[in-house]
Design a protein with these regions (language model features):
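Active-site pocket-lining/capping segments in soluble small-molecule metabolic enzymes
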Residues: 1-11, 29-30, 38-86
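Acidic, glycine-enriched active-site microenvironments
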Residues: 24, 28
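Flexible loop residues that form catalytic
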Residues: 33
Length: 86
């Protein structure tokens, strides 16, 4: 079973990758807020496989830290039920 760390884990820099890898994670989905330059730096700083969103919804919060959906709609984005309140 492959383990992937999605944006909900808030792994936004390569220094956090070893923690996820120690848990058995093989792929990290980087936050969609990162620029291309930041993604390049991330890739250079880890040997983990990276996945990048290139199109789609951009949260008003930092990926993985949204509380808007829960506050406005009673649906937790951090549990996969984002209401796209933004």
């Amino acid at each position: 079973l492959e383990l992937h760390a999605s944006t909900q884990m808030t792994i936004a820099e390569p220094a956090a990758a070893p923690f996820a890898q120690a848990l058995g994670v093989t792929r990290i989905v980087v936050p969609r807020e990162l620029s291309v330059a930041e993604i390049r730096q991330f890739a250079a700083g880890t040997d983990a496989e990276l996945e990048v969103f290139v199109h789609g919804a951009l949260c008003v919060s930092w990926s993985g830290q949204c509380l808007t959906s829960e506050a406005w709609g009673g649906r937790s984005a951090n549990r996969g039920q984002c209401a796209q309140s933004c």
